[in-house]
Structure formats: structure tokens, C-alpha cells
Amino acid sequence: MSSNKINKKSIARIAAVQAIYQNILQNNDDMDDIMQNVLSFYQNNNSITDLPENLKISLSISHFKMLVKSVFENINKLDEIIDNHLTNDKDPAHMPILLRALLRVSICELLFCPTTPAKVVINEYTDIANDMLNEHEIGFVNSVLDKIAKEHTRLI
């Protein structure tokens, strides 16, 4: 019987969301420190206790680092895009931290990673949102990513 594997880029996306969440929560702008903390967690599979025995977890380190660095480099533009997609009755300061982290990473990949098709980015982050956010937030993520994909051409 072969062992199960989850796509390395999918794990990198989850790890990037966790890194950006940590950045926001701890108000820590030391990108290298944040990346090292998250990478050490994933490199020590013993840290992940609720996995099926035959499931192997590894991440694309290059994709993870590219996502985190791109978010740090473009954070003001990403937040402006996110805030512009909020309805008038929503205060950006009250957006849940995990939702903002997921949107920062997903929008960053959508706009600054031209090798990944927009449909893949939208599907991947909607799946991640499904595991991390409530139903309303999942719909919001899907809607925002879909709108951005239609509004923006890829930046190179």
C-alpha cells in the first residue's frame, strides 16, 4: 500500500497563511524569524499529532518562502486591495486576523505568481478557508478572489 501525500505547494500555502497570521498576531516584522518558526514546525512531523499514520507532510520550501516574502514586500498594496473589497458597513480594523492573513497570502499569489492559474489559486485558498474559517468568511474569500482575478491582470 502506498503512503498518502498532500501536495507540497498546498502545504506551503497553509504554512504561509500560518506565518502571516503569526506576523499579525505577534506584531513581529522579522520575516526570517517567522519563516524559521513555521518551517521548523513542518520539518518536525512529530509536532503534528492528529495526522493519520500513513500521511506524509512536506512543503515546498521555495514556494513557502516566495509567498511570505511577497506578502512582506507588498503588504500595503495587499491591505489596500482587501480593504477596498469590504462593504461600507465593515471596518477593516475589525477583520478577523486569520481571515486577513489568508487574504493577504491568497491575493499575493493571485497577483504576483503568474505560473499558478487563477482558478487553482481560488480553489486552493477556498479549500484552506474551508478548514480554517466560518461559512460566511469562506464565501467572502471565494468572492474576493474571484473579483480580483477578474479585475486584475497578472503583475510580472
UniProtKB/Swiss-Prot annotation:
InterPro entries: NusB-like_sf, NusB_fam, NusB_RsmB_TIM44. GO terms for cellular component: cytosol. Transmembrane segments: none annotated. Gene3D superfamilies: NusB-like. One of its GO terms (biological process) is transcription antitermination. GO terms for molecular function: RNA binding. HAMAP family: NusB. Belongs to the NusB family. Involved in transcription antitermination. Required for transcription of ribosomal RNA (rRNA) genes. Binds specifically to the boxA antiterminator sequence of the ribosomal RNA (rrn) operons. This is Transcription antitermination protein NusB. It comes from Rickettsia massiliae (strain Mtu5). The gene is nusB.
